[in-house]
């Protein structure tokens, strides 16, 4: 909600551009550059007429005519200040800010005390972003007004001028001073919705939300149809997590100003904060239709798409954001994370490294970069980054846990175990450290400790078929056959198609003397192994077929898909790939039949 120096003249300021219209133009006693055949008197009379015509046109808001006439003045008598000052004011009204600045600077060089020229030049500076220069002139104007007030009736800056003064102060980081000026403007014109809105914006920039919200509510009391008031109030309420009211206000902003891309973007943010990414995505897309260059809308849409699993679209949008704003570290970090989630750690690492360099105390930046290094199997780099993160936050659960995993991958169990034990202490409700500790203790032959950690992990998180199978295998090694059988049966209940649990249970049952049940489990396990091997062969054949399709070798691809289905008739991916290949050959009926088989298999999948 920053106050922006837009390249437009706010309506509030339109009355500030003063044109001095003298009864007679000031004749020059200096030699002019007019044509030699004309007398100085004739030149001055023509300049006087042009000045009168120009200022008269300006008074009627005919600024194009005023510009033409006043250009004649400065051409005929370039050393007369009034011509430059009046032309500068007109150019300012026309939005020709660089040209206005040139004329107004010339006017002040000729007559430094011209308050109208000073005022208009300050406004022109503000409109072009030269806020430091604008502030210097505003300060001078204000000081001169105070000096005159000592002897004459009190003189204060107009509300419109205070408005522009405050905007320039805010742009130079002087928010306290800007707020004071804007409060003065509001006091002078308490029924101005524009001024209350600007004051509320300044409070929002300082995160003084209660005062900001009060000002925005006053804006809407004065003018219930003020779109900016609804927008800014909604954004302030969003910052305070008052989501239902924020959504209401931002919806009103969009109704009052349906072409306002910023309102659509803020409404999308409110929906996202309310965990409604479907509506958020609709609003961000609407914002981009209204303003395809909106970097904020692009960035927010990318994040929403990322949350809903559309990572490829998110990456494409974030690349556009980073290209538009190379210095936007947040967007770069988001792109790095999106690339990481897409499995492209190689491209992610430069963005994540840059983020960490810019925010060395950011724990999440350490976690993300370490994860990218792990994805690239650069385990030493991951360990280095995680240890660096712990120097900034030594009690961080995730850093200790991730470091334990990285050290485990280095087969450094002695170093990994203390990190995982620390993680378990930091977050007693997390099952992952206990499970990993159980695996490490089992690898080291420390079976009692392994059983303790694994059983604790399974109590905390029982929906883990692999965990029950591992615990069952451990109990078998410890000769705790009843416990082993119970754990393995639970593994089979959760994942009945996994062969290893059946085969291990068969061994346990045989050792218990239950030969008949052992034989049944062994037979089931062997059958599942055969199915698993067939599925693996089908996957290889299907992948080969996909490669052939990319090369345009459709007939050969069909052979590979059919080979895959001979190995595993229930492999839906092979049916779907075969359907696409048959369709390429124009065999639509056969293609549709294969596609139906794929649909049925996918629907029947648990």
Please place each PLM-identified region on the residue numbering:
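Structural signature of tandem alpha-helical TPR/SEL1-like repeats
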Residues: 60-72, 93-106, 128-145, 170-184, ...
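Structural marker of alpha-solenoid helical repeat scaffolds
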Residues: 76, 110, 144, 188, ...
